[in-house]
Curated annotation (Swiss-Prot):
One of its GO terms (molecular function) is asparaginyl-tRNA synthase (glutamine-hydrolyzing) activity. It is an enzyme of class 6 (ligase). Its EC number is 6.3.5.-. GO terms for biological process: glutaminyl-tRNAGln biosynthesis via transamidation; regulation of translational fidelity; translation. Belongs to the GatC family. Heterotrimer of A, B and C subunits. It catalyses: L-glutamyl-tRNA(Gln) + L-glutamine + ATP + H2O = L-glutaminyl-tRNA(Gln) + L-glutamate + ADP + phosphate + H(+); L-aspartyl-tRNA(Asn) + L-glutamine + ATP + H2O = L-asparaginyl-tRNA(Asn) + L-glutamate + ADP + phosphate + 2 H(+). Keywords: ATP-binding, Ligase, Nucleotide-binding, Protein biosynthesis. Allows the formation of correctly charged Asn-tRNA(Asn) or Gln-tRNA(Gln) through the transamidation of misacylated Asp-tRNA(Asn) or Glu-tRNA(Gln) in organisms which lack either or both of asparaginyl-tRNA or glutaminyl-tRNA synthetases. The reaction takes place in the presence of glutamine and ATP through an activated phospho-Asp-tRNA(Asn) or phospho-Glu-tRNA(Gln). Coiled coil: none annotated. This is Aspartyl/glutamyl-tRNA(Asn/Gln) amidotransferase subunit C. It comes from the Bacteria. It comes from Methylobacterium nodulans (strain LMG 21967 / CNCM I-2342 / ORS 2060).
Length: 95
């Protein structure tokens, strides 16, 4: 797969990044290099490799679920300029 100048401009537009005409060719080269590397990764045979979520084995510690309020409401809103019943008060922005 190859990225052309029009695709670079479209990606920049979607990412809301201003890209000058002089910046398009270097970005095009970089994106093509990245895609070439990804294609190389796709060619690697991983049929005998077991999927994993971490490089190091980890056992998840489980605990009993307990519903609580956390006990931190007052600490959380302590520095807020306006609060009511441990909730933040903010100015109305939509009528």
């Amino acid at each position: 797969m190859s990225v052309d100048a029009q695709t670079v401009r479209r990606i920049a537009h979607l990412a809301r990044i201003a890209v000058s005409d002089a910046e398009v060719p270097p970005l095009q080269d970089e994106l093509n290099a990245i895609l070439a590397f990804v294609e190389q990764l796709g060619a690697v045979d991983v049929s005998g490799v077991e999927p994993m979520t971490s490089v190091t084995p980890m056992a998840m510690k489980q605990r009993e679920d307990a519903v609580t309020d956390g006990g931190y409401a007052r600490d959380i809103v302590f520095n807020a300029p306006l609060t009511e019943d441990n909730y933040f008060l903010v100015p109305k922005v939509v009528e």
